[in-house]
Amino acid sequence: MASLKDMRVRIASTKATQKITKAMQMVAASKLRRAQLAAEAARPYAEKMDAVISNIAAASAGSPASSKLLAGTGRDQVHLLLVCTGERGLSGAFNSSIVRLARERALALMNQGKDVKFFCVGRKGYEQLRRQFEKQIIAHVDLRSVRQIGFVHAEDIAKQVIARFDAGEFDVCTLFYSRFKSVIAQIPTAQQIIPLVVEAPAANAAPVALYEYEPEEDEILSALLPRNVGVQIFRALLENNASFYGAQMSAMDNATRNAGEMIRKQTLVYNRTRQAMITKELIEIISGAEAV
């Protein structure tokens, strides 16, 4: 059985850990609101960008001059998985859930005879995927030094991805990230960004207004499509940022509660052990006095 001193040290250590988890919870809570607002503000812009491009693409359907970012390469053999995760841990299943979704997609594609490559954004995803797919990781972007994510960071990633696409390194690119829903709910999401998936209008949808474009549709698309890749990546990074702080806040709250429960149990064991030792000493003193 541990001595009383060991028990006191253990209780003190648990209390110190509880203070750390509580502080991390408060920091995550303070950063969550701003990250949530940024993610929610980016959604309408990204969705509207998709809608505008879909409208223009419908007008230029079948044009031989259509951008490869829209028309694709005509093949479906090489898939690039753009996996966006966090740079830090202590956030519950936030990172592992994104990696799990990407890994499942990769294995499914490989079982179909497809070639799979990875482009990792974030240290945690890179470290996890490297164990199984090290030779298939073609790029890794580390954002640990970035204090606040801006469009310039997403644009830089988009340029790297598009350059590899233009060089013929892959045919399809799918973006993986965590969509923020609430503090306790973050949804791992996969979104194909190259070639862009243009959804056909529903049968009962209202007729779309006809527009005349200046310059030509293909010229507009050639300018908008690369930017759209950057916009979708930027949205994913913002969603990830909000999801990370939400997951970390929830995880640290659970850790703080668990530490409190451990302290309660450890203190109970300590008090019972101390009481038993005092009782034993009293019995020994009384027995000695009676013997005299």
UniProtKB/Swiss-Prot annotation:
Q: Which UniProt keywords apply?
A: ATP synthesis, Cell inner membrane, Cell membrane, CF(1), Hydrogen ion transport, Ion transport, Membrane, Transport
InterPro entries in UniProt = ATP_synth_F1_ATPase_gsu, ATP_synth_F1_gsu, ATP_synth_F1_gsu_CS
What cellular component GO annotations does this protein have? plasma membrane; proton-transporting ATP synthase complex
Q: Where are the transmembrane segments?
A: none
Under Gene Ontology molecular function, one entry of this record is:
proton-transporting ATP synthase activity, rotational mechanism
Write down the superkingdom of origin: Bacteria
Provide the topology term for how it sits in the membrane.
Peripheral membrane protein
Q: What does this protein do?
A: Produces ATP from ADP in the presence of a proton gradient across the membrane. The gamma chain is believed to be important in regulating ATPase activity and the flow of protons through the CF(0) complex.
Q: Which NCBIfam families match?
A: ATPsyn_F1gamma, PRK05621.1-4
Name the family: Belongs to the ATPase gamma chain family.
| Protein's recorded name | ATP synthase gamma chain
Q: Which organism is this protein's natural source?
A: Bradyrhizobium sp. (strain ORS 278)
Q: Which gene is annotated as encoding this protein in its UniProt record?
A: atpG
